[in-house]
Every structure is written in structure tokens, then in C-alpha cells.
């Protein structure tokens, strides 16, 4: 998704909302479309990486699963709850928050999170590598 051309631009192009929020919505929509469209079920070996930690996709997994349980149209292309497929994709670490990164890792597993930079749209200070190496949660939990 582009920071200046996404679904949030149409609704509210002010206050940097398209970059700060719209990009995350688009990331989640990509994940939902791949999952509910059955792409990951039809192609189980396909490797997909969703940017920006998947946006709110993992946070919404419970709602997606509930929708799959109670709405027949959500089960047309997939035979398992959507959260199952979230754990088959990869995500970059660009969450900009230790809490969000921790939630992502706890939801999909550290083996599904890769280094990202968000370049050229956002300049990192410190660098992505420095940021990860300074995350107490990662250092304490995974012996980086």
C-alpha cells in the first residue's frame, strides 16, 4: 500500500491518516483477501510476507474466526479458521511499537517475523537492526 494513495485517503486525507492508519488497513485487507479467498489453502507452500506487521490483521483474528464460525459465506473458500492461515504467512517487524511487535510474535510465532525497514517512506532512528536489538522483550525471550 502507498502512504498517499489508499482507502483512508478517500475518507480523510488529513493529519497523515493515510500514512499512519490507511497503510495498516490496506495491509490487513491484503491478508484477509488472501485468507478468505482461499489462496493459502489452495497453495499451501506459497510464501507471502505482509508489511507493517500485518497491520491490524492479527489483532482482528478473533473476530475473523468468529465470522468464519457463524457466517457461511466466510467458509466458502477455506476449511479452517482464518487465524490458522495467519500463522502461515510472514510479517515484517515494522510495528513501531514493542507492544505491537510482542503481540505479533505471540500470535504468529517469532519464526514468522522478518526484519523490515519501511524505507523509503519512513526514516528510522535508530536503524531497524538497532531497534530490534534494543527490544527488551526479544532479548529476554529469545536470547538474541
What are these regions (language model features)?
Residues 12-38, 42-43, 47-144:
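H/E-rich (His + Asp/Glu) clusters that bind or coordinate divalent metals
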Residues 1-6, 119-121:
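Short glycine-enriched loops at secondary-structure junctions
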Amino acid at each position: 500500500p502507498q502512504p498517499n494513495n489508499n482507502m483512508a485517503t478517500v475518507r480523510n486525507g488529513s493529519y497523515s491518516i493515510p500514512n499512519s492508519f490507511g497503510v495498516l488497513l490496506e495491509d490487513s485487507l491484503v491478508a484477509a483477501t488472501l485468507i478468505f479467498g482461499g489462496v493459502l489453502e489452495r497453495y499451501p507452500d506459497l510464501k507471502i510476507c505482509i508489511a507493517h506487521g500485518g497491520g491490524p490483521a492479527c489483532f482482528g483474528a478473533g473476530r475473523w474466526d468468529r465470522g468464519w464460525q457463524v457466517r457461511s459465506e466466510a467458509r466458502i473458500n477455506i476449511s479452517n479458521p482464518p487465524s490458522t492461515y495467519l500463522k502461515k504467512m510472514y510479517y515484517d517487524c515494522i510495528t513501531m511499537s514493542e507492544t505491537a511487535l510482542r503481540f505479533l510474535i505471540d500470535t504468529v510465532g517469532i519464526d514468522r517475523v522478518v526484519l523490515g525497514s519501511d524505507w523509503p517512506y519512513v526514516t528510522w532512528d535508530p536503524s531497524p537492526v538497532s531497534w530490534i536489538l534494543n527490544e527488551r522483550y526479544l532479548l529476554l525471550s529469545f536470547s538474541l
